[in-house]
Amino acid sequence: MHQMNAKMHFRFVFALLIVSFNHDVLGKNLKYRIYEEQRVGSVIARLSEDVADVLLKLPNPSTVRFRAMQRGNSPLLVVNEDNGEISIGATIDREQLCQKNLNCSIEFDVITLPTEHLQLFHIEVEVLDINDNSPQFSRSLIPIEISESAAVGTRIPLDSAFDPDVGENSLHTYSLSANDFFNIEVRTRTDGAKYAELIVVRELDRELKSSYELQLTASDMGVPQRSGSSILKISISDSNDNSPAFEQQSYIIQLLENSPVGTLLLDLNATDPDEGANGKIVYSFSSHVSPKIMETFKIDSERGHLTLFKQVDYEITKSYEIDVQAQDLGPNSIPAHCKIIIKVVDVNDNKPEININLMSPGKEEISYIFEGDPIDTFVALVRVQDKDSGLNGEIVCKLHGHGHFKLQKTYENNYLILTNATLDREKRSEYSLTVIAEDRGTPSLSTVKHFTVQINDINDNPPHFQRSRYEFVISENNSPGAYITTVTATDPDLGENGQVTYTILESFILGSSITTYVTIDPSNGAIYALRIFDHEEVSQITFVVEARDGGSPKQLVSNTTVVLTIIDENDNVPVVIGPALRNNTAEITIPKGAESGFHVTRIRAIDRDSGVNAELSCAIVAGNEENIFIIDPRSCDIHTNVSMDSVPYTEWELSVIIQDKGNPQLHTKVLLKCMIFEYAESVTSTAMTSVSQASLDVSMIIIISLGAICAVLLVIMVLFATRCNREKKDTRSYNCRVAESTYQHHPKRPSRQIHKGDITLVPTINGTLPIRSHHRSSPSSSPTLERGQMGSRQSHNSHQSLNSLVTISSNHVPENFSLELTHATPAVEQVSQLLSMLHQGQYQPRPSFRGNKYSRSYRYALQDMDKFSLKDSGRGDSEAGDSDYDLGRDSPIDRLLGEGFSDLFLTDGRIPAAMRLCTEECRVLGHSDQCWMPPLPSPSSDYRSNMFIPGEEFPTQPQQQHPHQSLEDDAQPADSGEKKKSFSTFGKDSPNDEDTGDTSTSSLLSEMSSVFQRLLPPSLDTYSECSEVDRSNSLERRKGPLPAKTVGYPQGVAAWAASTHFQNPTTNCGPPLGTHSSVQPSSKWLPAMEEIPENYEEDDFDNVLNHLNDGKHELMDASELVAEINKLLQDVRQS
């Protein structure tokens, strides 16, 4: 007994694992066995262990969950979602679950979650029977009546016992208590049920014994074995000669399961030869027939018709075995028995059944899946079945609805509905699907079932603004809390996923948080102002609005930029910033001698507004009734309209209004107190102005301070640079005595090569040559200082007279003629060039008559020549005309004077070759290029015949540097084919030449003669000796930039220039050899020449001549003029 109980409580579990070959979705078929009546909660299996090999193929096996798709509403088994543990959820009674079916099992499916990697496991749990039921009889006392004349072997069917168990636990055998007259035989029906028949084994004798009580026992073979019993009470009746008899002892009938109720199954016919009551037969079911048979069939007691009382079902009961008896009505009647076996024939009478197992609890016809799930996401599990057999039970399943879903068969008649595409709820939120199951019977039967798939929303859409940038305008001076605008973002998601909340992202404007300027309603996106906006403070506010949904687990956001432009209003009056005001009043001083148009002051005003609101205009509204002042409305400049000398008043009060052009216009009035002051009172006025300027703002003071600092630094830099240059020049000072005394001890220097970069000539075309006095003073400890100063003054007067001579000659140069004179050329050489070009016919003096006046100025200053000086090479050699110039060199002026200078003044009326093309129109309209450009001789290849080299060396200038470029010393002059002209042949043309003089030359010489004949020669005792050059003056003479372009001089001038400037000094500091040193320069030139103005023109010179005539200076003849010019040139040459 102990072993039997242990077996009942032992959980026998085993699994039959079948690897799926249909699709990856179907993982395995799992089969387990358990005994019925197990304790609730008993564990049957753990899927996480049994299907571990399948789970390992998934991306995240540790996160897999299990869900059971139960069939029916009775959850006998429970599946744990975490580990797939299968346990008993309720007491399982196999007899109740499967009745007498030999195979009893519970089938369900388990899927894995999430469904993106769905795996389907088919679970079958077979319930095993235990012997928990004993066989039982329907009656505890079974009465049986037998005639004493019954023959041996007569069989009487007995009531069957019922045992709900199956197999060995079901009814196995019957037994009858021991006796000598009766025995039993156990027989099996077509349905497998066992029954017993009572058999007469000996003849009966009623007189001996009229009744028997025997115990009928039914037992099984279970462990432990169980049994049930009933009492047979057998009565022996008197003999009845004849008993009814059936034609056959048994019948087999085929019954279609779809046969209607009332169908006649069998017409029983029993016969009895007796007559009367003994021959009348009554039909009935045997006493041991089960109630189920009595409910399904019906027998007519008189006619013996067996009819169908209840429709049969092949799928429930495939056959029936009925015991029928016939008995007459006579006394001691003995019934006759007949067995009828009814076999139910299957027909296609059952439509396929569709069972859709959805994951949505509570709603069988709606399946929920999430949008965005991948393809092959699980939707539903479909199981179809047909109770029919054969072709009638074979089913074809189809899915109708939408291409986004598909039907996939797993095993037997089980199908999966999976997604065939990624779904988007925002496009379509619901799908209606139809499952059709159709069998293969004839005619075919089908079943249709509908269900709905609803798409659950996920937070897959961020809020969306219509624009990425919103621009709005708002006027300044708004009220706090004023509504500005609304920005809205839409979110197509549902619920909290589509609930949008608005915020302004943190930013700063002028150091303040944006949240102090504007705010936004988080629910609807309405933007409001938090403060009064000022266009002058902030003209534009830019901030970012963020829209955030309420989705989970992650909220989605989007941004948009909002730009608020603050429109300017005319809310600021003009503010006057100059002149300085005190109590809105400014004091302005005007000098007494101010003429009309004198600039009195300028009113400077600003307006913090913008656009037309800041456009200002000024006007005098009071105090100017006599129009003494005028004001420019745009610049606000105030000028005098009349001369202040003619105004009787000394003080005015002008009311000036400054207004903008806004709407409405705003203005500011200022009062200007204008006062006339004398020059003597300028100091007081300046003091008053200083007091008024004290009210300048801080920024102006800072600017003035910075300017003063910069000025001080600049002065320091200039002083430092000057000192450095002076120290540098200490070693470069030249003393003629020292140089000449030491020069003879030095070896002879080689001739310096002439470079093209050294030749620097700047033409003056109708230009101005400035004339300014240049006073030099150099402190010296030499005993000859006083004489040097006297010589310097005399040199100055001589230079000025000579410059005047150049100015007179230059005035007669035609305007279309390029006069090749440079500022760097000494006055002596300029005169020589003019005379040489005049002699060679390279230009003709412009006629001096009133009808052809040109407004031209020729300025020439001897001191300005020093700016272009190329002297001071560091060796002591200097340029002509300078105080340290070496007088030992030959000058072409000496040659000029010695070889017939007086020939220049021969005016015999001869016309030079260069004037042959002139016409009478030249006197009225001026000379043309054809007049002043005669055929010239071929230029010489010798650069010394065509170029003028001012000095041997070019000092380096700060602005430009001219690198030395060597020229060949042995350059041979080309044969010009024409005899060179020199000062020895000046004015001496061949007899075949035309006359060289003309009226223009006579006019020039006449004017020169008129000037010099009125000069009185002064007396000068001695010439001053050479003195040391002042270093500071030498520095000033070198300030000017060197000309950048070299121009060749005429052939004749270049010849003596080149021959003179490359001679080495050989004499002491006395007059040059070959000069008329005994002739004293006449100083009666000097006062006359000093009266010639700097801006010399023809009319000016005429005035000088008239002035000289009025002074009654005595006249000089031509020869005296020549002598005076000779003295002048020698004086300048020596100085």
Swiss-Prot record:
Region Disordered, annotated ranges: 769-800, 869-889, 942-1003, 1023-1046
Key words of the record: Calcium, Cell adhesion, Cell membrane, Glycoprotein, Membrane, Repeat, Signal, Transmembrane, Transmembrane helix
Top-level taxonomic group: Eukaryota
Topology versus the membrane: Single-pass type I membrane protein
Bias (Basic and acidic residues): 869-878, 1028-1039
Species annotation: Homo sapiens
Subcellular location: Cell membrane
The protein's name in its UniProt record: Protocadherin-18
Renumbered residue ranges of the record's region Interaction with DAB1: 893-1135
